[in-house]
Amino acid sequence: MAQEKMDLDFEADTSEGATLRRSNSAPLIHVLSDLSQVFEPYPLRTGRTSTAIMSHHSLEEGLDMMNRETTNEREAQAGMQISQSWDESLSLSDSDFDKPEKLYSPKRIDFTPVSPAPSPTRGFGKQCLSPSLQMFVSSSGMPPSPVLNPRHFSRRSQSPVKCIRPSVLGPLKRKGEMEMESQPKRPFQGTTSMLSTNPAQLSDFSSCSDILDGSSISSGLSSDSLATGSAPAESPVACSNSCSPFILMDDLSPK
């Protein structure tokens, strides 16, 4: 059982004349039960908590800054590599050709010397044959020289007349020529002695012309003689009928 101790103090109050009693009781507890409440003071850790939070935030900010710097460095390196690759692909120099590359690489270029003496207008006097471009590329960046390698010789300009190849079907014929050739050829039925320039034959031709003139005169005389009833005189044309190639109209007339 709990024991209670009570202290009673009697004090006299002179002002009011009344008696006041003050009691001070404090229980004496020697055994703690399970139902008894235990009050513990809450520790104040405000300083420690704020310091830990600030350090944690600063650590996170530091990590974020490191990540951002790493990302920026990677982007800068990627940009530098891209620019270097573009510069290497666009620039042609001897240092690029000395690097070991693959056989079928587009940067692999074989040098073929044009002449033993370098050209005064060319930097190196060499031309590069690019397998990927299938053309000659000058190492100095200038257009290639017109003189090519004998192995890869080809004409750059040719005459348009020489470039025309004969047709497989045969030579072309014009319309007028085809019409002339389509007509059948007629054999020449006259004498070819008229084309000769022999003086003896020319005299025969002159005599034949005289005979023709005489035949016209004799035909007129024969008509007159038939009208008068006298026999015509023998014309000198009859003696030359055997030698003349022409046939007179008097021979064909009925007698």
UniProtKB/Swiss-Prot annotation:
The modification N-acetylalanine is found at residue 2. Residues 174-184 have a biased composition (Basic and acidic residues). Residues 1-24, 169-196, 219-238 are annotated as: Disordered. One of its GO terms (molecular function) is protein serine/threonine phosphatase inhibitor activity. The modification Phosphoserine is found at residues 25, 33, 50, 58, 115, 119, 145. The modification Phosphothreonine is found at residue 112. The keyword Phosphoprotein applies. Keywords: Acetylation, Methylation, Phosphoprotein. InterPro entries: PBIR1/2/3. The modification Omega-N-methylarginine is found at residue 122. Belongs to the FAM122 family. This is PABIR family member 2. The gene is Pabir2.
